[in-house]
Amino acid sequence: MKIITCYKCVPDEQDIAINNADGTLDFSKADSKISQYDLNAIEAACQLKQQLGDAQVVAMSVGGKALTNAKGRKDVLSRGPDELIVVIDDQFEQALPQHTATALAAAAQKSGFDLLICGDGSSDLYAQQVGLLVGEALNIPAINGVSKILSLTDSTLTVERELEDEVETLSIPLPAVIAVSTDINTPQIPSMKAILGAAKKPVQVWSPADIGLNSVPAYSTQQVAAPKQRERQRVVIEGDGEEQIAAFVENLRKII
């Protein structure tokens, strides 16, 4: 059984600064990290590996220069995957979800797999599209919002997902793609032994040409700005008479 778990490198929000002049966001000093939602996907894949015993877990990502960071690669591999495959090109920095999915699908097809696991979305865009789009690109079953994996055999996957007013139990044939929610598990913190052992695990670096892609269409960011902060008026209305109630209503109208 070969399981691919996909992840995205995103800017660490703690390092993002706001330019006081125009409110735009400054990413220049922001380190990259694994998208928080993808940590659940990695953990889910590694838990399946422990249950099955003979499974192989491959971490996979497409992106720009952030994927060249040795510390970032080590972080991923320390969390349990046996191998890492990255497809690197500057064009992926601003790739739209469908083009990211196309690249992941091509890379997964080249690698070979039985099950592909994604997070429900990414910490930066949270488009919640890539997992299902990968399934569409490969023409295989895909399910999002998976909150529990009930069973996995050589031919069938059974999962559970919580909807607004019901819980669904779904069985699909392999190969398949699932996008897992944060309810599925709590990602573990890697041990020191796992961190040291991560440096010995294999890493494959591919280009778009290696997976049959010539160019990657991208979106153009016009501006990313923080919402303008409004100064609090600090209006205090004392009492509970009709005049105070009328004053309260009038102040509410001003802010609606």
From Swiss-Prot:
| Domain of life where this protein originates | Bacteria
Instruction: Spell out the Gene3D superfamilies in the cross-references.
Output: HUPs
InterPro entries found in the cross-reference section = ET-Flavoprotein_bsu_CS, ETF_a/b_N, ETF_b, ETF_beta_N, FixA, Rossmann-like_a/b/a_fold
Q: Does the keyword Electron transport apply?
A: yes
**Keyword line:** Electron transport, Transport
Q: In which pathway does it act?
A: Amine and polyamine metabolism; carnitine metabolism
A biological process (GO) of this protein is:
carnitine metabolic process
What would be one Pfam family of this protein? ETF
Q: Which GO terms describe its molecular function?
A: electron transfer activity
Q: What is the stated purpose of this protein? A: Required for anaerobic carnitine reduction. May bring reductant to CaiA.
Family, similarity comment: Belongs to the ETF beta-subunit/FixA family.
| Subunit text | Heterodimer of FixA and FixB.
HAMAP family cross-referenced by the UniProt entry: FixA
Q: NCBIfam families attached here?
A: PRK03359.1 (NF002888)
Q: What is this protein called?
A: Protein FixA
Q: Which organism is it from?
A: Salmonella paratyphi A (strain AKU_12601)
List the gene name: fixA
